[in-house]
């Protein structure tokens, strides 16, 4: 006999339900046979925590199981593809579900409806989970991966938070390739969240972290709004208890020898202190959670204070206006056409940069157009001599178009080719914007060159960067701020990374990097949180002549003041009491500085001013004053019930001052723009037949800033316009005021309408004078402004009908507007007359009445019931109001 060593084979662990019942498990996933038999939906197989999941291949991801085929994930066209490995912190939840058990409705583009016979959830974590779902229908977002849903509308469960797909693949909404597999949208459900997050991505760990920080900031705002709601409820409860105690303890106070009058005085002081603690800065937050849903697909921008979207969610009238727009689009079922990315895909396939012939480049660099442009004035780190020397030495002779492989080139040549590319694009933009003389046959190739060179440089380790590389990054970020061509502008701060990583001894380069970083963020109202505001701009040595570098030297003190103001606004704890004195003090300093600067340069015949800074300051002043206006207006409505007439008068006066500051700074903006950037003299001479625009070639530097700020000011002007217009159709507001106030409001209403029509004429003229080449981003921006004004005027014409016929009366019916929210009705007649005269001053400056009558734009769809929105023009409408 032979002794045979027998080894007992350990069976794999069963599911949790079979372990409990101590019965055999067939290990069928996602639900084993026993659990199906006993109708146990919480069947799952726990895996060890911290398990690293295998990374799928770059070509796609295949899954095999019951009824599962292969799913392919589109990886995009990025050059730098790196795997972002993320280890799971929780046991991996098995969420493999048969694709054939789901139904997909392609007509719904914002959400997908998934149906299954029985839902299940993972109860293996130690965190608090949501109640068990027994419904047969599970709703999930198109980018969602969670099966567990919380019954609470305010607080998500821990499983929900764990299953939020915050990785860049979901946040950036990478395109899926629907041509390979009609069920490719199941890629996030057929695997667990960790597998999906570990897919090959063309992005770096730093980019992923930045996106996740933005996500967490939004979650923080949600938590803060919940805290605000809780604090308000507690304060109301405490106020009720205080009133009850005062009534119940009157006898007790008398026994203690307290006189009623003295006691009443003490109670009044306590009440006043309690009210002062309720002075939240609500103009910067959204107190109504439902507002985020009511104006879809508009997205809130809590990290960008100076944008249209930010004020639309926080102003009562703009918010209702967008609700009506949403109703119109929802009723008519308009759809946005998909973008065409064929050219971008074609360029990214070849890693070669192509340039015009050497002779053309040298002729361009020595041309009179480049000398007249005086590029060193706004780009002080540019050196034309070194660039010409590089072209002579590196480019082959002949009439052929040279090409270079970005993979084989050293870093020094890459950066020089990048600087040359940006210079040619700058010169092309300056020539083609109005003069129509540019040779734009190579523009697409140059844009492709810039993308490829930047992508190749990002693959190089930061420690190998030299000063020329940093200079190229700075020049590229400057060109990016002009936003002429690039639809996919980078939001990363590569220039700031260079500032923090290197000790840059070149003064011009050092301050140019800081100036560009700050200007880029301040235009949108972003705080420079990565570098303290006090350290953003260092003093200029006395040995350097500031007149030689106007782009860097101008308004350093005002830049520091603006940085402090934006940082305070970004850091306002709106759920706690806030003192507005510091905000108003910085705002006053910035306003006085801009006023002095404008007066100085308006009297200077040789204007060498970098006007982008001043436009940026004015944008900050107008937005901050509008926040204060909305804040004081909301405080006034609360004061009707809880405060004395003195407080109401005080808030009304503050609103009047804020509104006058808004209008005055808008006037300064139009004066600067149409005197120095786009001279309006030719527009005023329409009546004489002289309709030529006199360009100096530098308008392209300011086109993007002008368009962005103009759109903001149009939205704010329309908010004031609606406050005046409300008396035309709402009897409630009309009865709140007397006849004299109503007359003044109608005068302001007509004058704002006149201003909007004049701006429409001017912008239309500027657009027509530009090159008809649609590739210019600034021209598209001018079209957005025209569409904004056009649909606003149509809405004003038909607003009364919209107020009566709205389907959702609780949301969009203007006849049910919140009471006492229109502070203009509380202004004295003298103050309203001052506002009217200020608007009249702007209107008279823009254009004469005779010119308006000759150049008026006739809108055939002015009386249209749905604002003239059709399938053909819906893309333009959507781009103007929602992008």
Curated annotation (Swiss-Prot):
Cellular localization per UniProt: Nucleus
Biased composition (Basic and acidic residues): 252-270
Keyword NADP: no
Main subcellular location: nucleus
Residue ranges the UniProt entry marks as DNA-binding: 14-45
GO molecular function terms attached to this record: DNA-binding transcription factor activity, RNA polymerase II-specific; sequence-specific DNA binding; zinc ion binding
Pfam family, one: Zn_clus
Bias (Polar residues): 130-149, 241-251
Sequence positions bearing Phosphoserine: 150
Function, in words: Component of the chromatin structure-remodeling complex (RSC), which is involved in transcription regulation and nucleosome positioning. RSC is responsible for the transfer of a histone octamer from a nucleosome core particle to naked DNA. The reaction requires ATP and involves an activated RSC-nucleosome intermediate. Remodeling reaction also involves DNA translocation, DNA twist and conformational change.
Subunit structure comment from the entry: Forms a heteromer with RSC3. Interacts with NPL6. Component of the two forms of the RSC complex composed of at least either RSC1 or RSC2, and ARP7, ARP9, LDB7, NPL6, RSC3, RSC30, RSC4, RSC58, RSC6, RSC8, RSC9, SFH1, STH1, HTL1 and probably RTT102. The complexes interact with histone and histone variant components of centromeric chromatin. Component of a fungal-specific module (HTL1-LDB7-NPL6-RSC3-RSC30) within the RSC complex.
Protein name: Chromatin structure-remodeling complex protein RSC30
Biological source species: Saccharomyces cerevisiae (strain ATCC 204508 / S288c)
């Amino acid at each position: 006999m032979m002794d045979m060593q027998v080894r007992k084979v350990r069976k794999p662990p069963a599911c949790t339900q079979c372990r409990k019942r101590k019965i055999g498990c067939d290990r069928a996933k996602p639900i084993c046979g026993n659990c199906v038999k006993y109708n146990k939906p919480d069947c799952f197989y726990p895996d060890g925590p911290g398990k690293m999941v295998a990374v799928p291949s770059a070509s796609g991801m295949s899954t095999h199981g019951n009824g599962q085929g292969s799913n392919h994930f589109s990886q995009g066209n990025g050059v730098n593809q790196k795997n972002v490995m993320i280890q799971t912190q929780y046991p991996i939840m098995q969420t493999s579900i048969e694709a054939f058990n789901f139904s997909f409705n392609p007509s719904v583009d914002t959400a997908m409806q998934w149906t299954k016979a029985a839902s299940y959830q993972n109860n293996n974590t130690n965190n608090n989970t949501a109640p068990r779902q027994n419904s047969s229908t599970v709703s999930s977002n198109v980018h969602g991966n969670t099966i567990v849903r919380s019954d609470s509308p305010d607080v998500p469960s821990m499983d929900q938070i764990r299953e939020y797909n915050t990785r860049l693949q979901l946040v950036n909404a990478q395109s899926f390739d629907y041509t390979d597999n009609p069920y490719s949208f199941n890629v996030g459900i057929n695997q667990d969240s960790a597998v999906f997050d570990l897919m090959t991505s063309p992005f770096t760990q730093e980019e992923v972290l930045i996106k996740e920080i933005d996500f967490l900031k939004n979650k923080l705002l949600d938590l803060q709004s919940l805290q605000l709601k809780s604090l308000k409820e507690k304060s109301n409860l405490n106020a009720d208890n205080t009133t009850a105690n005062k009534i119940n303890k009157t006898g007790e106070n008398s026994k203690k020898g307290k006189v009623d009058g003295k006691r009443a005085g003490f109670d009044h002081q306590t009440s006043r202190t309690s009210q002062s603690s309720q002075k939240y800065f609500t103009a910067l937050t959204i107190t109504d959670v439902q507002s985020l849903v009511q104006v879809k697909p508009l997205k809130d921008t809590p990290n960008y204070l100076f944008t249209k979207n930010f004020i639309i969610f926080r102003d009562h009238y703009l918010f209702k206006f967008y609700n009506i727009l949403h109703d119109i689009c929802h009723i008519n079922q308009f759809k946005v056409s998909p973008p065409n990315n064929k050219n971008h895909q074609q360029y990214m396939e070849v890693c070669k940069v192509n340039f015009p012939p050497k002779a053309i480049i040298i002729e361009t660099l020595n041309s009179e157009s480049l000398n007249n442009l005086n590029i060193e004035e706004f780009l002080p780190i540019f050196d034309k001599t070194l660039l010409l020397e590089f072209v002579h030495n590196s480019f082959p002779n002949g009439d052929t178009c040279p090409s270079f492989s970005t993979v084989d080139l050293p870093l020094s040549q890459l950066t020089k080719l990048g600087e040359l590319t940006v210079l040619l694009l700058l010169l092309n933009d300056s020539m083609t914007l109005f003069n129509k003389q540019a040779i734009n046959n190579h523009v697409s190739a140059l844009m492709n060159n810039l993308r490829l060179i930047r992508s190749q440089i990002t693959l190089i380790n930061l420690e190998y960067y030299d000063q020329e590389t940093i200079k190229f990054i700075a020049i590229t970020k400057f060109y990016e701020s002009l936003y002429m061509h690039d639809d996919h502008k980078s939001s990363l701060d590569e220039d700031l990374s260079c500032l923090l990583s290197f000790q840059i001894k070149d003064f011009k380069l050092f301050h140019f990097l800081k100036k560009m970083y700050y200007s880029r963020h301040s235009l949108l109202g972003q705080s420079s949180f990565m570098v303290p505001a006090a350290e953003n701009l260092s003093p200029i040595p006395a040995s350097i002549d500031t007149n030689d570098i106007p782009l860097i030297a101008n308004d350093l003190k005002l830049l520091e003041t603006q940085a402090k103001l934006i940082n305070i606004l970004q850091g306002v704890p709106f759920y706690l009491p806030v003192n507005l004195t510091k905000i108003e003090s910085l705002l006053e300093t910035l306003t006085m500085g801009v006023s002095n600067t404008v007066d100085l340069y308006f009297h200077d015949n040789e204007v060498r001013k970098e006007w982008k800074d001043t436009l940026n300051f004015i944008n900050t002043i107008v937005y901050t004053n509008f926040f204060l206006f909305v804040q004081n207006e909301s405080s006034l409505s609360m004061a009707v019930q809880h405060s004395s007439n003195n407080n109401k008068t005080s808030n009304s006066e503050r609103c009047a001052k804020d509104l006058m500051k808004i209008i005055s700074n808008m006037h300064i903006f139009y004066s600067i723009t149409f005197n120095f950037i786009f001279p309006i003299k030719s527009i005023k001479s329409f009546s004489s037949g002289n309709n030529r625009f006199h360009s100096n070639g530098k308008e392209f530097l300011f086109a993007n800033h002008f368009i962005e700020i103009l759109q903001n000011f149009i939205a704010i002007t329309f908010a004031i316009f609606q406050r005046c217009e409300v008396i035309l159709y709402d009897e409630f507001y009309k009865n709140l005021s007397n006849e004299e106030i109503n007359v003044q409001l109608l005068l302001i209403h007509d004058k704002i309408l006149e201003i909007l029509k004049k701006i429409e004429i001017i912008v239309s003229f500027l657009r027509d004078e530009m090159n008809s080449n649609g590739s210019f981003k600034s021209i598209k921006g001018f079209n957005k402004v025209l569409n904004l004004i056009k649909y606003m005027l149509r809405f004003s014409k038909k607003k009364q009908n919209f107020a009566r016929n709205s389907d959702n009366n609780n949301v969009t019916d203007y006849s049910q507007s919140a009471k006492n929210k229109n502070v203009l009705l509380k202004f004295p007649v003298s103050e309203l007359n001052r506002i009217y005269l200020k608007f009249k001053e702007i209107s008279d400056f823009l254009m004469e009445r005779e010119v308006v009558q000759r150049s008026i734009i006739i809108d055939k769809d002015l009386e249209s019931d749905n604002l003239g929105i059709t399938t053909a023009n819906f893309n333009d409408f959507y781009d103007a109001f929602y992008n």
